[in-house]
């Protein structure tokens, strides 16, 4: 009896183990025909050459699914992209400086005139005395009680009727905790994030995985913590902010990474494509762009480009 029981238990354990192995998700090859990244804004906060401030859009199967940042002018690019806001699952904010977030209320206002029914997820770092948290940002923007546009507050308030709700998630930010955190994993899209160093301002880097492809975003950061190569490891695309030249000093160097670091980061992460965005007057001129490119290529030998608004890049 003991032998039979042991055999039965052993068989069940083996069966369960086999089922567990077979049920694990095996990483698939990047289905690049299904995924594309579109530039909604490729400049910083300055009023330069008619390009919008920071914003990116990830498409899956010809549907706009993820927005990263919502800088001034990026909503207009969203409209020009022919995307439908009803399809968007989430807006990921790297941080809450105006050049990354100012168009958010306009997205929500515009969505009022669409057929959107599903909830919208909003994520961003926790706040400090210098910037708001994601929750406070949303409340100050469209909250019923203290928002700039309180007439949009029903989308945040679960007690009020609205066609859909905005679900806000604060991502814990810390210089001392560089743990990669999974913040969303549903409907075929997985999002992970890590805290980054943007001077005293809470900021997040993101990695979005879908259809076997991975696209990572540095946001604004100086690279001092060395956090991004791990998050972006083997990404098909890495979007890096090239806001300053190599000779940057002081505040600029404390807020942004230099081209030489971008090259080292891209090499260490082993990314397939490197996109340089968030260009500013100090990094935009052709001479400066060439200097940045030369410094980056000393370490990174992969595909490097400077995309403009509305450009589409496939993994």
Residue ranges and their predicted role:
Residues 20-215, 293-298, 303-314:
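Binuclear metal-dependent hydrolase catalytic cores
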Residues 5, 42, 94, 218, ...:
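Ser/Thr-centric signal marking residues that sit
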Residues 196, 220-221:
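Residue-level structural signal for beta-strand termini and adjacent loop
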Residues 2, 95-100, 198-199, 256-259, ...:
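Histidine-centered active-site/metal-ligand motif
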Residues 205, 212-214, 221-311:
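Cap/insert and terminal regions of metallo-dependent hydrolase folds
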Residues 1-7:
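Bacterial N-terminal signal peptides that target proteins for export
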Residues 15-17:
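N-terminal signal peptide c-region/cleavage motif recognized by signal peptidases
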């Amino acid at each position: 009896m003991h032998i039979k029981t042991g055999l039965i238990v052993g068989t069940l354990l083996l069966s369960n183990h086999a089922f567990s192995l077979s049920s694990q998700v095996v990483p698939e090859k990047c289905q690049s025909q299904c995924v594309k990244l579109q530039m909604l804004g490729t400049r910083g906060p300055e009023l330069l050459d008619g390009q919008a401030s920071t914003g990116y859009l990830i498409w899956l199967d010809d549907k706009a699914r993820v927005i990263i940042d919502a800088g001034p002018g990026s909503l207009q690019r969203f409209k020009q992209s022919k995307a439908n806001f009803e399809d968007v699952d989430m807006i990921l904010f790297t941080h809450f400086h105006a050049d990354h977030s100012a168009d958010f209320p306009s997205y929500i206002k515009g969505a009022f005139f669409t057929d959107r029914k599903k909830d919208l997820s909003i994520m961003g770092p926790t706040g400090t005395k210098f910037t708001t948290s994601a929750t406070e940002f949303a409340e100050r923007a469209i909250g019923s009680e203290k928002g700039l546009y309180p007439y949009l507050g029903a989308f945040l308030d679960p007690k009020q009727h609205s066609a859909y709700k905005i679900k806000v998630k604060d991502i814990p930010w810390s210089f001392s905790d560089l743990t990669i955190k999974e913040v969303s994993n549903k409907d075929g899209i997985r999002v992970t994030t890590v805290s980054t160093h943007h001077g005293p301002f809470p900021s997040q880097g993101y990695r979005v995985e879908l259809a076997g492809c991975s696209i990572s975003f540095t946001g604004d950061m100086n690279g001092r913590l060395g956090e991004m190569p791990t998050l972006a490891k083997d990404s098909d695309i890495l979007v890096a902010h090239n806001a300053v030249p190599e000779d940057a000093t002081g505040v600029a160097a404390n807020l942004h990474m230099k081209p030489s670091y971008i090259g080292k980061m891209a090499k260490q992460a082993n990314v397939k494509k490197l996109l340089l965005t968030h260009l500013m007057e100090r990094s935009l001129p052709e001479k400066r762009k060439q200097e940045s490119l030369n410094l980056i290529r000393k370490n990174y030998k992969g595909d490097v480009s400077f995309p403009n608004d509305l450009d589409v890049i496939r993994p």
